[in-house]
Amino acid sequence: MLQPKRTKFRKMMKGRNRGLATGHKVSFGEIGLQAVGRCRLSARQIESARRAMTRHVKRQGKIWIRVFPDKPVTKKPLEVRMGKGKGSVEYWVAKIKPGQMLFEMQGVEETVAIEAFALASGKLPVKTTIIKRTVM
């Protein structure tokens, strides 16, 4: 699963998820899956969506993952009283803003790519839309 190799600090504050995304265009592939809402995508969810897409296209073409889980989420163990410091890092998340491109695909038929993105969007906790590359 995806997570940073090393970070400056082990734990991070929760923060807020406001504003719009900057990476909102199809940059690498021909067709992309774009987030409509905002959420926190865990590394497990990203991997699950990637596997669903890869299996559907039968390892043809190329898939780009445009998000990376770089924010640690901590959790205290069960049945532990409050206080005594912050819990240990449980998993990693990527903060998703509206308009952010999640996945891109190239080298497969458009109908197959749309079906693969539909499978992947079922694994994600955010509404998505499919965007095609516009040639200038």
Curated annotation (Swiss-Prot):
InterPro entries: Ribosomal_uL16 (IPR047873), Ribosomal_uL16_bact-type (IPR000114), Ribosomal_uL16_CS (IPR020798), Ribosomal_uL16_dom (IPR016180), Ribosomal_uL16_sf (IPR036920). CDD domains: Ribosomal_L16_L10e. One of its GO terms (molecular function) is tRNA binding. Pfam families: Ribosomal_L16. Keywords: Ribonucleoprotein, Ribosomal protein, RNA-binding, rRNA-binding, tRNA-binding. GO terms for biological process: translation. GO terms for cellular component: cytosolic large ribosomal subunit. Belongs to the universal ribosomal protein uL16 family. Binds 23S rRNA and is also seen to make contacts with the A and possibly P site tRNAs. NCBIfam families: rplP_bact (TIGR01164). Part of the 50S ribosomal subunit. This is Large ribosomal subunit protein uL16. The gene is rplP.
